Amino acid sequence: MTRARWGLTLLGFLAVASAGVARAGELVVWHAYRAEEKAAFEKVAKAYEASKPGTKVTLLAVPYDAFADKITAAVPRGKGPDVFIFAQDRLGGWIETGNTIEPIDFYLDEPTRARFIPTTLEAMTYRGTVYGLPLNYKVITLIYNKKLVTAPPKTDEELVALARKLTDKGAGRFGLAYSYADYYYHAALQNAFGGRVFDAGAPVLNNPENVKAALFLQKWIKDGILPAEPSSALITSLFNEGKAGVVFSGPWFLGEIAKGVDYGLALLPSIAEAGGKPMRPWMTVEGAYVAAPSKQKDLAYDFVKFVTDVKSAMVMAVEGRQTPSNRKVYDDPKVAKDPMLAAFKAQVDVAIPMPNVPEMTMVWSPATTAMNTMIRGTSPQAALDKAQAQVAKDVAGLRKRP
């Protein structure tokens, strides 16, 4: 081989090697963050790059409404990112589809497990295997107008007494307002009674505890303390106009509260008829996942681990206004003294992860129909029996698919 040809061969080898090294140091990450969350996450990604010289993290913000479909269509075909961030409600479906999310038990050590609020890691677990690390969570809690409510109610008896005092239908004022026809919101009451959607993987919407919870809701409706049309727009309007003393909602509601409205947050009340147990909302947990087709799995997991550590979680909490799953964050005075962050942490301690099984997608429509008929006086047993029959049929059809 001539010296010239040897030089060309060597240059070619070095070019290939160099390209390989460059690719090995590049990560593509998809997320749906906006505004302050987006800015905080970008800061965390830059910090990761600084900690790993030669590493490049490319972030792509995907509109939330299109995000799930984009993951479903692109990731299994190897056309997606190395890491993506999404809530756990689609986790089971993507795992069953295959080639979408990489299991991470192989990487996960005990110190990393221990950094999280246990139920948030539970939300990342499917059939005993962990598939993501939890970034943050969302739950509904009690939000009250301090001009109308001096001390938030701790029990349902206190809540009803307060709501009766504040309610004046003629003036369009209500003591309590929340989206009680929405099954997601109703779950907090249902869970207080020990209700559930599945037993050992089988749908059980018409179980006795679910019926009791629905009967209890009907009592609140008959008391006249709730608006008849509980749309989110109406609830926001009532609260901002000083016509709702208490609402049940999540962190998304806080951004809709008008300037000048003095509000506070507190735990959802306990329910005497449920044995004094607290209302237990469903929590949705946003996880960071390694895409199964990624050729940079080790680096991708390293990034996922970094963005969920305590330093990153502090940035996401203080600057991004997220409620992190990393429990060490709440030991920091900046977070512990923050009314919003402290209140949601207290609420998540009694919350239940929303089911992440693929069958859950078949629950929403029949459950919503049942809720809409029950709030108009239909027997909860009859309404839930009908919903159960539909969900059982749909689930059976799903499981017959090849």
Identify the function of each model-found stretch.
Residues 131-135, 140, 158-203, 209, ...:
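Extracytoplasmic/periplasmic solute-binding protein
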Residues 81-82, 111-144, 175, 276-280, ...:
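A structural signal for short loop-to-beta-strand junctions that line the ligand-binding cleft
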Residues 82-85, 245-250, 264:
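Paired acidic/hydrophobic, glycine-rich loop segments that form the ligand-binding mouth/hinge
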Residues 40-44, 155, 209-216, 286, ...:
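Short amphipathic alpha-helical coupling segments at ligand-binding clamshell hinges
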